[in-house]
Amino acid sequence: MKQILVTFNNSLEDEYALDFAAKLAKQSHSYLHVLTFGNDLQGVEAENLEYENAKKPNRTPHNTKTGITEDLISKIAFLDERLIQIESLPEFDYSEINRLIKKLEIDLVVAGLHKKTKINDHVFGSITEKLVRSVNCPIITVKEKFQNESVKTIVFASNFEEEIKLPFFGFLKLSGQLKAKTHLLYVNTPDNFKNTDYINQTMNWFSEDYQKNAFTLNTYDAHSVEEGVLAFAKEINADLIGIISHEKTRFTLMSSSLTEKLINISEIPILNVSIV
């Protein structure tokens, strides 16, 4: 992970996301790109507001300390200023965001999610809701202020089927770069009950291609998958919850709409990785 993009739209949750993304950048020695939209750019120097194309991203040098640039950098003063780049788009457009992600070779997107909104609402008003459903990149959603200085403990919840193996390599690479302890979790529920032998065989098969000291294997009994994931994460004081969803339907692995349920109710940051 070398390039992190965080969206910023002047909300409290966006400030939480900015802080979390900056801490990740510091921890992983990555560059941080702060993406702003529309009116948020009013404080930037006029020359930085000129667009060759109305849809073309504008890049503000990190040393342009005026308006929003100065304000943003001051919020994350603990991060080396040389690692910060301000990006801008005139409006939210996920196709343009994906184009920017590709152009900058972004490895991870971080975005704040308003507590009062739900990701399965019929009207998708927030930037984060649209990003989760459309962005072609792993994305972390943040709702609360991250109190720690770094990510030390990660829960990876899955059904550990064959299609999870390939994207899990990327997830493990991220946790390795962060030097975080990873806990693999299988949640056993009444509606989809599996016996202990089946779960152990599944998780052992899944983990046989990886170093055993890279993570721990865990099973948790709960009424629902999301309940089990959150309960286990709280028990071990997890800093991040990771989950993999399918690109075409976005939220269908393990249980219907699992990722959106977790994002809606979790106070712990959620990392969603899409299967290509």
Task: Give the location of each predicted region.
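Short secondary-structure boundary segments
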Residues: 36, 113, 186, 244-246, ...
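Hydrophobic alpha-helical segments and helix pairs
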Residues: 96-144
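A short acidic, glycine-rich active-site loop
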Residues: 52-66
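Charged helix-capping and loop-helix junction motifs
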Residues: 124-127, 198-202, 254-261
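Small/aliphatic-rich secondary-structure junction motif
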Residues: 1-53, 153-219, 238-240, 265
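Short, flexible loop segments at boundaries between secondary-structure elements
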Residues: 268-276
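Local beta-strand N-terminus motif with an aromatic residue
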Residues: 1, 105-107, 137, 151, ...
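Structural beta-alpha unit
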Residues: 74-109, 210-260, 264, 268
